[in-house]
Amino acid sequence: LQEPIAGQIRVFDQGMVGKEEDEATDVRRRWGVLFQGGALFSTLTVAENIQVPLREFYPEFSKDLLDEIARYKIFLSGLPPEAAHKYPSELSGGMRKRASLARALAMDPELLFLDEPTSGLDPIGAANFDNLTRDLKETLGLTVFLITHDLDTLYAICDRVAVLADQKVIAIGAIEELLAIDHPWINAYFSGPRGRAARRGHSDQNDKVRAEMQQRGRS
């Protein structure tokens, strides 16, 4: 939506700055976006929202095919089948997030952008959304690029983290690598009370998973 004033943006090894619109559109077909507020069209049902990008890029698709795709994306996002005919105003906050995710998955993207995916969700809903994102990443082979301030989300699903501070990227790496960096902002963020709590929770969860796997191995 905005042209950068400096630097380059490369996606799928293609420069996006100054790219011809037709060429840029071909690249955009390969990614999906979940906006922070959902950005669902209020006058369309969940199924119709999911079909919006499909109608734009594939006008030759029949109604039956569009409906079938919408049903499948609703299933992938963890929504009940009856959500297809509901309007955004009839959904809870967590369901709206999932409906927005279903739309982001409509084009079978290789790359999924998530903008603050757990904002506005209670701790249980946020954890469930993290688990869903991780499952989709592993099942569909997605590359997920997300913006978040949620430490639990970082620990739950992120392989690499880019830290933005002082109007620039100050570090990139796995969380364990970032913890070894002596920078005041990084120390305050990852080693403050919330950071320590998230790290303990992640460690406890890993211990639980290992114990369950060992138990299965003995049974």
Model-derived regions, located:
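Conserved ABC ATPase "signature" region
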Residues: 15, 63-82
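Conserved ABC ATPase signature
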Residues: 87-91, 95
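Conserved catalytic motifs of ABC-family nucleotide-binding domains
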Residues: 108
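Catalytic Walker B motif of ABC-type/P-loop ATPase nucleotide-binding domains
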Residues: 112-115
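A short, surface-exposed alpha-helical micro-motif characterized by mixed small hydrophobic
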Residues: 154-156
